[in-house]
Curated annotation (Swiss-Prot):
Belongs to the polyribonucleotide nucleotidyltransferase family. It is found in: Cytoplasm. One of its GO terms (cellular component) is cytosol. InterPro entries: ExoRNase_PH_dom1, ExoRNase_PH_dom2, ExoRNase_PH_dom2_sf, KH_dom, KH_dom_type_1, KH_dom_type_1_sf, NA-bd_OB-fold, PNPase. GO terms for molecular function: 3'-5'-RNA exonuclease activity; magnesium ion binding; polyribonucleotide nucleotidyltransferase activity; RNA binding. This is Polyribonucleotide nucleotidyltransferase. Pfam families: KH_1, RNase_PH, RNase_PH_C, S1. The keyword Phosphoprotein does not apply.
């Protein structure tokens, strides 16, 4: 076993190799502080036939024992990955995926298992570091060293590896990953930071990444690694030459510039089919079928090259826009009659239907994960059905991509939400992607912002998002605004920025190339700001402020604060009182016994108000001389017991009765006055009458209102 240690940026990094998981192609145990992960990398012996991508899978396993916890719920064992585990897996996947050879077709699985956590150093950061080492010490073809760092902005200063307390005060919470040469991945949220602040954070993060990579280089120098030789399949020279000759550059250009995603896609498919059939006729169906994946790859390369040259040489994009142009935008609100808020945002051929649902405090998402416990009052769920891209696929649960896109949009919007004291509702946004041709996550931000205002949620301002792209060639560097799906696929960078008029609230970047300079990043950020401000104007033109009232179909929620020591009075023995209130007034009641906050929820404001009035009555301090209309609950030879308010019963002694005890019935209503409260809080009552002629002890009998009297 070999161990390496180094202090970097005030954190101790420790790496162990050769002790555990020796059957994997590569394995390390990496530790920062007390957060420890085991990262393994394994590659299959044979290639997967008939695919045109690198079959990489990254799994992030949370083990509750790492935090000294036992999983909650009925089954005391970890099940399917939590949302945070999926997001952490994506954080590791995105910076390492571009570093595999494009021709690799052997399955590769990277598994990062959290085996200890100190709740200070987040496991995803350690996971990127460990995965990079596991791949580099293995024989798996992998070209690069990566590392990641979390960045905060506290009191105007950039903080690397911020603690949980610092993040609570931080204006920025981003994860930055990269190689020694460039930043390759960014993901995070902000509280309206400026473009210059974001750029400084990225540059400071890259300096830290270089220090971590230097430590990785020291570790890797110990190994004499011989990478597996994966033969790259190529087309026979004769067929490749003929295929290139059959590709007419002008026709390819004309087909690429056909307007409309579907029409363009069909035209390009037809052109490939035409060339394919010519080759089939010349070389035979069997031979060409064997080479079909390679031919598709070659065609894809030609399309990528041609699209990029059109942009560079002609300054025109596939939909005839200039680099800074934004596609036509339309916005609508209030589309659906019964939902609490709705909006349709359409930008070119990308369309998101945003729906807001308002719920009670008990509708909050319960979180019981490795690092977090508690509840979450704002949720955004992103759905990407196959029809949005004109495809047929099985409908299953949400994909990792859907979870990741929803999380990004949620982070973009949460900063503008009102606090719970001002707006005590649980808020859920669902984004239905109805059509997609690039930047559907940023369309989700826009539809979500519109739908929140349509629902009457008092958000402070609109939030909009835009996706940027990059074409990086030797002769030019072109930043593209509001990218199409093809520009994302064949371009060099996907750069998403969301925010308000006053700053950035969410940020995501994936870069496929090295050599992205600070100047280029600054240019992209400033161009994104121009685009964001333009989109925001469209949102404000549609709905400029939240509606004054909530939907009539939204629940009514009213909150009162009581002395926490009196919570038991509302609950009652065995929950008797609160159950009666819920039943009698047709409401839901949520009580926080720590803060004394009581939320009353119902479909009818009058019933909610009546329930609150009754709660106030229950909590009212009872004094000698107070008069109540109470219900007889028990009769004894010495007197009767009368409930004057829920849970508060006093003794009405027979000597204090005006009425003959023999005529009193259980359930009837009596007017009583509090005559005494002893030192144990017990109530003594006397029957009360407005008439001065009625005296206690003078027995009289008369018909009085009783429960169920006819």
């Amino acid at each position: 076993m070999k161990t390496w240690k180094r202090e970097i940026l005030g954190r101790e990094f420790i790496v162990e190799h050769g002790k555990v998981a020796k059957q994997a192609n590569g394995a390390v145990v990496a530790r920062i502080g007390d957060t420890t992960v085991l990262a393994t990398a394994v590659m299959s012996d044979s290639a997967v036939e008939g695919i045109d991508f690198v079959p990489l899978t990254v799994e992030f396993q949370e083990r509750f024992y790492a935090a000294g916890k036992i999983p909650g719920g009925f089954i005391k064992r970890e099940g399917k990955p939590s949302e945070m585990a999926i997001l952490s897996a994506r954080t590791i996947d995105r910076p390492i995926r571009p570093l595999f050879p494009k021709h690799l077709r052997n399955e590769v699985q990277v598994v990062v298992t959290v085996i200890s956590t100190d709740s200070v150093n987040t496991p995803d950061i350690v996971g990127v570091f460990a995965a990079s080492l596991a791949l580099n010490i293995s024989d798996i073809p992998f070209n690069g060293i990566v590392a990641a760092v979390r960045v905060g902005l506290v009191d105007g200063k950039i903080v690397l590896f911020p603690t949980e307390d610092q993040l609570q005060k931080s204006l920025l919470d981003i994860v930055v990953a990269g190689t020694e040469d460039t930043i390759t991945m960014v993901e995070g949220e902000a509280k309206e930071v400026s473009e210059s602040q974001m750029l400084q954070a990225l540059l400071k993060a890259h300096d830290a990444i270089k220090q971590i990579i230097d430590f990785e280089k020291e570790i890797l120098s110990y190994f004499n690694i011989e990478k597996a030789q994966i033969a790259e399949k190529t087309l026979p020279e004769e067929i490749e030459k003929e295929f290139s000759q059959l590709l007419d550059g002008n026709e390819l250009r004309e087909r690429l510039l056909i307007q409309g995603k579907k029409a363009r896609s069909n035209a390009l498919s037809e052109y490939f089919k035409k060339i394919y059939e010519i080759l089939e006729a010349r070389y035979g169906t069997e031979k060409i079928e064997e080479l079909s994946v390679l031919l598709k790859d070659k065609y894809e390369e030609a399309l990528k090259y041609k699209m990029r040259r059109i942009i560079v040489e002609e300054g025109t994009r596939l939909d005839m826009r200039k680099p800074k142009d934004i596609r036509p935008i339309t916005c609508e609100t209030g589309l659906l009659p019964r939902v609490h808020g709705s909006a349709l945002f359409t930008r070119g051929e990308t369309q998101s239907l945003g729906i807001v649902t308002l719920g009670a405090p008990m509708d909050e998402q319960i979180i019981d994960s490795l690092l977090e416990e508690g509840t979450k009052r704002f949720m955004l769920h992103y759905n990407f059905p196959p029809f949005s891209t004109g495809e047929v696929k099985p409908l299953r649960g949400p994909s990792r991509r859907e979870i990741g896109h929803g999380h990004l949009a949620e982070r973009a919007l949460k900063f503008v939400l009102p606090d719970e004291d001002r707006f005590p509702y649980t808020i859920r946004i669902v984004s239905e992607i109805l059509e997609s041709n690039g930047s559907s996550s940023m369309a989700t931000v826009c539809s979500g912002s519109l739908a929140l205002m349509d629902a009457g949620v008092p958000i402070s301002k609109h939030v909009a998002g835009v996706a940027m792209g990059l074409i990086l060639e030797k002769d030019s560097q072109i930043v593209l605004t509001d990218i199409l799906g093809a520009e994302d696929h064949w371009g060099d960078m996907d750069f998403k920025v969301a925010g308000t008029r006053d700053g950035i609230t969410a940020f995501q970047m994936d870069c496929k190339v090295s050599g992205v300079s600070a100047d280029l990043l600054e240019r992209a950020l400033n161009q994104a700001k121009e685009a964001r401000l333009y989109v925001l104007e469209k949102l404000y033109e549609t709905i400029s402020k939240p509606r004054d009232t909530l939907s009539k179909y939204a629940p009514v929620i009213k909150v009162i604060s009581i002395d926490p020591s009196k919570v038991a009075e509302i609950i009652g023995p065995g929950g008797k009182i609160i159950k009666a209130l819920i039943k009698d007034y047709d409401v839901k009641i949520s009580v926080d016994d720590l803060t004394g906050k009581v939320s009353v929820i119902g479909g009818n404001e009058e019933k909610v108000d009546a329930a609150i009035e009754q709660i106030n009555s229950i909590l009212k301090e009872i004094s000698v001389g107070d008069v109540f209309s109470g219900k007889v609950t028990r009769i004894e030879p010495f007197g009767v017991f009368v409930e004057i308010s829920p849970g508060k019963v006093g003794l009405l002694h027979q000597s204090k009765l005006i009425t003959d005890l023999k005529t009193v019935k259980i359930g009837e209503t009596m007017r009583v006055k509090v005559s005494n409260i002893d030192n144990l809080g017990r109530l003594q009552l006397e029957e009360f009458s407005d008439s001065p002629d009625h005296k206690h002890g003078e027995k009289r009998s008369f018909k009085r209102h009783r429960k169920n009297d006819n």
